[in-house]
Curated annotation (Swiss-Prot):
Annotated source species: Staphylococcus aureus (strain JH9)
UniProt: NADPH binding residues: 11-12, 32, 106, 141, 256, 280, 282
Originating gene: gpsA
Protein name: Glycerol-3-phosphate dehydrogenase [NAD(P)+]
UniProt KW keywords: Cytoplasm, Lipid biosynthesis, Lipid metabolism, NAD, NADP, Nucleotide-binding, Oxidoreductase, Phospholipid biosynthesis, Phospholipid metabolism
Lineage, broadest ranks: Bacteria, Bacillati, Bacillota, Bacilli, Bacillales
GO cellular component terms given for this protein: cytosol
GO biological process: carbohydrate metabolic process; glycerol-3-phosphate biosynthetic process; glycerol-3-phosphate catabolic process; glycerophospholipid metabolic process; phospholipid biosynthetic process
């Protein structure tokens, strides 16, 4: 039995906390919202994010950062990308011993263009860092928490961290493969959110299966181009952390990125869509980061460029689709 602290009480962190508890581990969740903490401790639910799920009664929650830090030597970092550096820094300020960090965030930091593992590495002093890994792949929290068969990938620069992650999470409904390409797995999880928003737009406009298939295929191509430029193995993008995550995020209404895109395709403004969703949509921030990163690295990413124009320059979605279709003739 292993003690694990889960930082973050969103949908995926909650679903994975439930997996860990059902696997026999001691789980403490940390969150800032005292009402959510009290609800989990009293009712064993987290209705804001997983409305109908009844959680393992052995999961406990706290808003006390010191208690959360002292509880375990393994931390599951289930926070939005934009909050990761701040919380990791707060953790570091209170550490007195080495900890292992496993994150499930799917984004790239605005401004620095850093992957999440790099953000954590920046924030945690080397003397307290026992290793950093990621768990990623096609895994909607709504399905994981009700034990629908799900398969994901664990990756780290340290193979022992990948193996630890596999051992902690794997059971009869959650299968975990290890993968040595940390860069590729992290980029696959982050970049697919851009394509998922675009896929939602295509669906919201009412375009057919031909357009959806083309978008995912060409989206995977530009993900691979940037990934290879940044040091990833292109083959990673044909695995769970790449095309697997891309497919599930581009076709499902469980996906908040797809849902945002769908609302935009239906004619809603971004502010209106986000106010209705009341959730963090990583694809917005990732699009901003990757748009500038691709320009810096001189990588052609036409779908990302088009989505950036929709999200940040108020260009109409139909105009951007027209521009994509009328690009210069090229070989595939």
């Amino acid at each position: 039995m292993t003690k694990i602290t889960v930082f973050g009480m969103g949908s995926f962190g909650t679903a994975l906390a439930n997996v860990l508890a059902e696997n026999g581990h001691d789980v403490l969740m940390w969150g800032k919202n005292q009402d959510a903490v009290d609800e989990l401790n009293t009712c064993h639910t987290n209705k804001k994010y997983l409305k109908y799920a009844k959680l393992d009664v052995n999961i406990i929650a706290t808003s006390d950062m010191t208690k959360a830090i002292q509880f375990a030597d393994i931390y599951l970092m289930a926070l939005p990308t934009k909050a990761m550096r701040e919380v990791a820094t707060q953790i570091n300020d209170k550490l007195t011993s080495k900890k292992t960090f496993i994150h499930v965030a799917k984004g790239i930091e605005n401004g620095t263009f850093k992957r999440v593992s790099e953000m954590i590495e920046d924030s945690i002093s080397p003397e307290y860092n026992a290793g950093i890994g990621v768990l990623s792949g096609p895994s909607h929290a709504e399905e994981v928490v009700v034990k629908q068969p799900t398969t994901v990938a664990a990756s780290s620069k340290d193979k022992s961290v990948s193996k630890l992650t596999q051992d902690l999470f794997m059971n009869d409904y959650l299968r975990v493969y290890t993968n040595d390409d940390l860069i590729g797995v992290e980029l696959g999880g982050a970049l697919k959110n851009i394509i998922a928003v675009a896929s939602g737009i295509v669906a919201g406009i009412g375009y057919g299966d031909n357009a959806k298939a083309a978008l995912m295929t060409r989206g995977l191509a530009e993900i691979s181009r940037l990934g290879e430029k940044l040091g990833a193995d292109p083959m990673t993008f044909l695995g769970l952390g790449g095309i697997g995550d891309l497919i599930v995020t581009c076709i499902s209404t469980h996906s908040r990125n797809f849902t945002l895109g769908y609302k935009l395709g239906q004619g809603e403004s971004m502010d209106q869509a986000l106010s209705e969703m009341n959730m963090v949509v990583e694809g917005i921030y990732t699009t901003k980061s990757v748009y500038h990163l691709a320009k810096e690295k001189n990588v052609d990413m036409p779908i990302t460029n088009a989505l950036y124009r929709v999200l940040f320059e108020n260009i109409s979605v139909k105009e951007c689709v027209k521009d994509l279709m009328e690009r210069d003739k090229k070989s595939e």
